[in-house]
Amino acid sequence: MSIDIIKQQTKDLIDRLKSTTNNIGLGNSGNEYTVIVETFLYKFLNDKFIYEAKRTLPELADAEDVYEALERLPDEEYEEMCDMMLDTIVLKKEHLIPYLAKRQNEDNFATLFDATLEAIADTNEEIFYILNEDETRISIMKPLSEVVTGGSAKKNGFCKSLIGDVASFSFEAAFAAGYDFFSTIFEYLIKDYNSNGGGNYAEYYTPHAIASIMAQLLVDESEDVKSVTCYDPSAGTGTLVIALAHQIGEQNCTVFTQDISDKSSTMLMLNLILNSMSHSLTHVIQGNTLKHPYHKEGHELRKFDYIVSNPPFKLDFSEYHSDLEADHYRGRFFAGIPNIPNKDKKGMEIYLCFFQHLLYSLKD
């Protein structure tokens, strides 16, 4: 099957998920993106796990039904297989989509569906969370039926539709394409949340084409770069820093990010997983970079090899202006902090603070 066909089928899947959320009354609501992103992530994790399982145990690739072959596998052998699958989110047998699909007509299916998502997060709890600036952890897999108002029949029907949406095809043929495929798909996934007409993501997203150009300017293809750190202090959905990581080589660098938005941080986690960068998940921080910069070495702010950023240009930060003036890290705001205007505080030049933070965070 050609990559173009897989790409179109993936876009069709995203459209089906959006249709399902719209039909249940979640269209253009705050919960729409949660359902779409989490369900898409679940589908990706399922297919990625199967892809890696076949590579780990070649006999699975020859099985008439790989899911039945996995179900017959003794638990001890299944666990050994999972241990050998590096940089892959582990799924138990009962987490796989066909297992849920077989039970979709049960009276408590919504409860089962939600429990599966939470169990996946629990199984991978060491990496499957967003860390807040105050050290609290936020799971990126949450119960989805809870966003639906109504009784159990309505919730069951909604979760059944989601399973039906994701069960019709496989991502497997796309994994070899890697970044070139999934960067395009990610852009399509969030396009409805990247508009000024009612969307909330315009400030969080940099187009893939621009991100790629910036990455190529920073790292020449002839350079042999290894074991470096990449940082984005206003990461949004991660397009800039992931393009940079791809230019360097995903396994040759570690990504560090911070962003004040919980929504964009969730999207960033998905973006890292899609692009085989699960090793950087624990460095995704949700919080105010200027007021509470998180990444440190000892008592000092960490310095990074590469930094990319598309920070907000003008924003009202009068509420924590005094905190920045009394900044603990002496010399971070070496050029000063813009004054609070008498009028139009929304026009405060916050980009000047971010620019100084960038320079302070860059290795000599």
Where are these regions (language model features)?
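Alpha-helix initiation/capping motif
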Residues: 155, 174-175, 203, 257, ...
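Conserved S-adenosyl-L-methionine
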Residues: 200-309, 314-327
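Mobile active-site "lid"/loop adjacent to the S-adenosyl-L-methionine
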Residues: 313-353
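Non-catalytic, mostly N-terminal accessory regions of nucleic-acid modification and defense proteins
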Residues: 1-213, 218, 286
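Amphipathic alpha-helical transducer elements in NTP-driven molecular machines
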Residues: 7, 11, 262-266, 301-305, ...
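Conserved Class I SAM-dependent methyltransferase catalytic core
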Residues: 13, 29-38, 44, 214, ...
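A short, mixed-charge helix-start or loop-turn motif at secondary-structure junctions
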Residues: 196, 254, 337-341
